[in-house]
């Protein structure tokens, strides 16, 4: 689960981190009032969406007058912002931040942290190249990224933060400020089950103070049950509608950009199914794992979610019956096809528990379903059907 910038800043501020002050506005009148509250001379206005690249997409603007504020608010609020991190539809802009103008600054740094699966530790990253996409820095000048792995038994140590501060070229009081910021960030990360944390830029102002100008926070969704305050910050309008619907039925669904819908039981088999579709020249439209304990109702809903994607031109159902019986899956497929007006080819591959009975039910249903005898056969048939 992602947080908006204003939510992330409010959370980090609770841990004593210095953040750029800003006021949330949902319309032009509120934006003007916020502008005046901040002095009425200069302010930075930022669209609140769960995506990076807002500046290049027109989602950030410096306002020097009320007219600038009104124009930006009216043009951006209740529209959709398309950035390099969104799909073609973009993300809905329901609000903006009117923030204090902290420029000019002396330097812009970067500070971030992730859960590194290879080291199985929280890993901090810092760079002197703040204010730009960190992915670009990592690709072009990886030597400019400083990494620190944190031992979970002892936590982040002050000496580690000081070493990063020295590497960033900070001096005197700035070192102490940075140590406090990095330690507070680690505390916030652990206590709120962050999956991702990013301050870009972390600005060094002309008076020497260090300030978090932007904040990006992602929360581990599996931990939300124990984080009621954080869970209440969830903005469902920023999430894919199909993924949101899938979560209500405990379905693991991720929307992709292809045209072949996939329904599989088991994450590994789902990945293999997408791979073999690509191998035969197709493009998967989604990842969908109905799980080992799939019920008839969940399978029907999964079918509906797949077909709700208008780009889907064919569906591959790949079920290996273990805990899930293939005859139950077959009954669910028949019910779903009868309930939903299916106009695209559907290829079904059933193996394992009651596979023969499942295949018999499908054959006797009278529906136009394409049977497959193996994974390769299924992929070849669905790709051919889509291209026909």
Swiss-Prot record:
Binds 1 Mg(2+) ion per subunit. Pathway: Carbohydrate metabolism; tricarboxylic acid cycle; succinate from succinyl-CoA (ligase route): step 1/1. ATP binds at residues 46, 53-55, 100, 103, 108. It catalyses: succinate + ATP + CoA = succinyl-CoA + ADP + phosphate; GTP + succinate + CoA = succinyl-CoA + GDP + phosphate. Residues 9-245 form the ATP-grasp domain. One of its GO terms (cellular component) is cytosol. One of its GO terms (molecular function) is succinate-CoA ligase (ADP-forming) activity. Mg(2+) binds at residues 200, 214. Its cofactor is Mg(2+). It comes from the Bacteria. Keywords: ATP-binding, Ligase, Magnesium, Metal-binding, Nucleotide-binding, Tricarboxylic acid cycle. Belongs to the succinate/malate CoA ligase beta subunit family. Succinyl-CoA synthetase functions in the citric acid cycle (TCA), coupling the hydrolysis of succinyl-CoA to the synthesis of either ATP or GTP and thus represents the only step of substrate-level phosphorylation in the TCA. The beta subunit provides nucleotide specificity of the enzyme and binds the substrate succinate, while the binding sites for coenzyme A and phosphate are found in the alpha subunit. This is Succinate--CoA ligase [ADP-forming] subunit beta. It comes from Acinetobacter baumannii (strain SDF).
């Amino acid at each position: 689960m992602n947080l908006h910038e204003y939510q992330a800043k409010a959370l980090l501020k609770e841990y004593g981190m210095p953040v750029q002050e800003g006021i949330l506005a949902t319309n032009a009148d509120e934006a003007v009032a916020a502008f005046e509250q901040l002095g009425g001379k200069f302010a930075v206005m930022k669209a609140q969406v769960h995506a990076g690249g807002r500046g290049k997409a027109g989602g950030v603007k410096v306002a020097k007058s009320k007219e600038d504020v009104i124009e930006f608010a009216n043009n951006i609020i209740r529209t959709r912002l398309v950035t390099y991190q969104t799909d073609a539809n973009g993300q809905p802009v329901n609000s903006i931040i009117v923030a204090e103008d902290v420029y000019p600054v002396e330097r812009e740094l970067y500070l971030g942290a992730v859960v590194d699966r290879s080291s199985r530790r929280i890993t901090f990253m810092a760079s002197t190249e703040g204010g730009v996409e960190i992915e670009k820095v990592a690709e072009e000048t990886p030597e400019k990224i400083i990494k620190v792995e944190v031992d979970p038994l002892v936590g982040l140590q002050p000496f580690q933060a000081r070493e990063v501060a020295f590497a960033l070229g900070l001096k005197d009081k700035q070192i102490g400020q940075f140590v406090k910021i990095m330690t507070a960030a680690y505390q916030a990360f652990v206590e709120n089950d962050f999956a991702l944390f990013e301050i870009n830029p972390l600005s060094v102002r002309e008076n020497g103070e260090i300030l978090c100008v932007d904040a990006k926070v992602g929360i581990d969704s599996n931990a939300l049950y124990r984080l009621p305050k954080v869970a209440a910050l969830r903005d469902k309008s920023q999430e894919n509608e199909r993924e949101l619907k899938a979560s209500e039925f405990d379905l693991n669904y991720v929307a992709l950009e292809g045209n072949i819908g996939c329904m599989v039981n088991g994450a590994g088999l789902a990945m293999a199914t997408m791979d073999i579709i690509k191998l035969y020249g197709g493009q998967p439209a989604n990842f969908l794992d109905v799980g080992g304990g799939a019920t008839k109702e969940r399978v029907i809903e999964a079918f509906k979610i797949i077909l709700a994607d208008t780009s889907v031109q064919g569906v591959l159902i790949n079920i290996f019956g273990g805990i899930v019986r293939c005859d139950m899956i077959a009954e669910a497929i028949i019910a779903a096809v009868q309930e939903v007006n299916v106009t695209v080819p559907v290829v079904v591959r059933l193996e394992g528990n009651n596979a023969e009975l499942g295949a018999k039910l499908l054959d006797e249903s009278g529906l136009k379903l394409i049977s497959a005898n193996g994974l390769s056969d299924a992929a070849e048939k669905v790709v051919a059907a889509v291209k026909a």
